[in-house]
Curated annotation (Swiss-Prot):
It is found in: Cytoplasm. This is Phosphoglycerate kinase. Pathway: Carbohydrate degradation; glycolysis; pyruvate from D-glyceraldehyde 3-phosphate: step 2/5. SUPFAM superfamilies: Phosphoglycerate kinase.
Length: 387
């Protein structure tokens, strides 16, 4: 990957526009989960320390494009940044015709989705973004798979376009896990549907020494082995695909599971063999034997890629499987990389963030990179590096 890195540039006195991923949950005007902002702080601080005139922007939520809506304003992010940074921080609502920024000051440019043409990568909008800066820094891995005006078009027209430390770090960590992994490599793919992760499963089946499936995805594999899965979430039409994967690679299908007769937080868990599931039952977690089997596999891994929980961990009675897997990853000496919203929520719940080698901030971008797809924002940075 050949891109210009922000860390290699002299930013002093330059107008620097950072496209970050500050798309955080907000409730009653307050940020409720600051993980993405925290991940962006080192980039912001590095630019300010160099004496740059720093502007930062992001999308937040899904407002109607081209219309201002206070509900989706970046103001709560600005309030958070004011608490964390010693520099002056202000929010700029109207900025497309130009904005004044002083050295060592941080100006947050309001939600890019308030600008008409953002999502369609409108060229005239991209040029307006580009005219604001001397150096454009793409640091939002979470949106690198989208070709939009603030992630892609602007990089085409800015005087200099580079990768921020967070984006570069994400790409480097994923490259380490996928391009030439230390072996054995174990990949865990959980979540609800095979259909949304079929390409990922197929790609990883060719890279990983061991593929682990969990959640609703594992239910489809249980069904593929001929077992009744009752009212479990599974995809009948994808059983042939699951059978193909079972032939082509080693996938440990759950032999025991926790089931319930209702999908609720208070549902009672019953531990039973995968071959004994009744018509009115649904699988909501792995059984002890199956979870321990996965923990034993992870113990010997040298590289672990984790995307998705292995059960309905949000319900206390059905989080044991995900917790056993999570703690096995945390205790492993392997290089581990985790990504996806539910995965990050599980990491937070079990308090193991400091024991995962790399936590990716991207959901869709993480999966598309794993699938082997080119990320438009990264392709543009590579093109600019050649000029």
């Amino acid at each position: 990957m050949s891109v210009i890195k922000m860390t290699d540039l002299d930013l002093a006195g330059k107008r620097v526009l950072i496209r970050a991923d500050l798309n955080v949950p907000v409730k009653d005007g307050k940020v409720t989960s600051d993980a993405r902002i925290r991940a962006s702080l080192p980039t912001i601080e590095a630019a300010l320390k160099q004496g740059a005139k720093v502007m930062i922007t992001s999308h937040l939520g899904r407002p109607i494009e081209g219309e201002y809506n206070e509900e989706f304003s970046l103001k709560p992010v600005v309030d958070y940044l004011k608490e964390k940074l010693s520099s002056s921080v202000r929010l700029e609502k109207e900025y497309l015709e130009g904005v004044e920024v002083s050295e060592g000051e941080l100006v947050v440019l309001e939600n890019v989705r308030f600008n008409k043409g953002e999502k369609k990568d409108d060229e005239s909008l991209a040029k307006k973004y580009a005219s604001l800066c001397d150096i454009y820094v793409m640091d939002a891995f979470g949106t690198a798979h989208r070709a939009q005006a603030s992630t892609h078009g602007v990089a085409k027209f800015a005087p200099v376009a580079c990768a921020g430390p967070l984006l570069f770090g994400e790409l480097e960590a994923l490259g380490k896990a996928l391009d030439n992994p230390a072996r054995p490599m174990v990949a865990i793919v959980g979540g609800s549907k095979v259909s949304t992760k079929l390409t990922v499963l197929d790609t990883l089946s060719k890279i990983a020494d061991q593929l682990i499936v969990g959640g609703g995805i594992a239910n489809t594999f249980v069904a593929a082995e001929g077992h009744n899965v009752g009212r479990s979430l599974y995809e009948d039409d994808l059983i042939p695909e699951a059978k193909k994967l079972l032939i082509s690679c080693d996938i440990p299908v759950p032999t025991d599971v926790r089931v319930a007769t209702e999908f609720s937080e208070t549902a009672e868990a019953t531990l039973k063999s995968s071959s004994d599931i009744k018509d009115d039952e649904q699988i909501l977690d792995l059984g002890d034997e199956s979870a321990q089997r996965l923990a034993d596999i992870l113990k010997n891994a040298k590289t672990i890629l984790w995307n998705g929980p292995v059960g309905v961990f949000e319900f206390p009675n059905f989080r044991q499987g995900t917790e056993i897997v999570a703690r096995a990853i945390a205790d492993s000496d392997a290089f581990s990389i985790a990504g996806g919203g539910d995965t990050l929520a599980a990491i937070d719940l079990f308090g193991i963030a400091d024991k995962i080698s790399y936590i990716s901030t991207g959901g869709g971008a993480f999966l598309e990179f794993v699938e082997g797809k080119k990320l438009p924002a990264v392709v543009m940075l590579e093109e600019r590096a050649k000029q």
